[in-house]
């Protein structure tokens, strides 16, 4: 029982630390506090939620603190771009 509790606590704490460093979606109004640092693009998503997840992951990989999705489109395969901010 004690090992299960320890494992549960470790899992929760590791999840908290990962979300603290994840790039967050922003509105254009929020972006005034940060500087644009480039763009990221993603393709091959099956829906808009998957596309947003792919763009967020690419923004995080670039060290962004936030991102604004500029474009999204497609039918069977979604594609999109986002401006990243640091």
UniProtKB/Swiss-Prot annotation:
GO terms for cellular component: periplasmic space. InterPro entries: BhsA/McbA_stress_biofilm_assoc, Dodecin-like, YdgH-like_sf, YdgH/BhsA/McbA-like_dom. GO terms for biological process: colanic acid biosynthetic process; response to stress. Pfam families: YdgH_BhsA-like. Keywords: Periplasm, Signal. It comes from the Bacteria. It is found in: Periplasm. Induction: Repressed by McbR. The keyword Signal applies. Belongs to the BhsA/McbA family. Affects biofilm formation and mucoidy. This is Uncharacterized protein McbA. It comes from Escherichia coli (strain K12).
């Amino acid at each position: 029982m004690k090992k299960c509790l320890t494992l549960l606590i470790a899992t929760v704490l590791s999840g908290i630390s990962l979300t603290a460093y994840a790039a967050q979606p922003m509105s254009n109004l929020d972006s005034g506090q940060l500087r644009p640092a480039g763009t990221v693009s993603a393709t091959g998503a099956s829906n808009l939620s998957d596309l947003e997840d792919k763009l967020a992951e690419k923004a995080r990989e670039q060290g962004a603190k936030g991102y604004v999705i500029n474009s999204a489109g497609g039918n069977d395969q979604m594609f999109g771009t986002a401006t990243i901010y640091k």
